[in-house]
Amino acid sequence: VVGRNEGCPDEWMREKKTIREHLDYKFIMALEGNDVASNLKWVMSSNSLAVMTRPTCETWFMEGTLVAGYHYVEVKEDFSDLPETKAQNLLRELYEYYIEHPEQAEDIIRHAHEYVRQFQDKERENLISLMVLDKYFRLSGQQ
């Protein structure tokens, strides 16, 4: 848990890290809380592997089109895909697997970068924004 302690054991508490500090890690968890995993966009733009559950929230980033094992490393929401349920063991197993198979890790990172690239075209994003506004005004009778 990062930030304020809301009844969690003290050993779970950590000081908040900056994005720059996170980028020192090979694996970064991108977990949904009450909404999307807000760090997913910058994690997928980094050279770290995004580790996450299958996304359930959808935004302009089209999280529902992401493919597990291709754009990110998937874990089950309750970690039941592992013999032991502690997150430490999950991370250890993932770490060992992708350290032993760096080409697979690099492929996932490359695919994540390719996915993010589609949102980095300013002209295209501006055109899409105008098209959304046009459709909104037409459907709401304001055109």
Feature names for model-found ranges:
Residues K16-Q143:
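Catalytic binding pocket for nucleotide-activated donors in carbohydrate/polymer assembly enzymes
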Residues V1-K16, F61:
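Catalytic donor nucleotide-activated moiety binding site of glycosyltransferases and closely related
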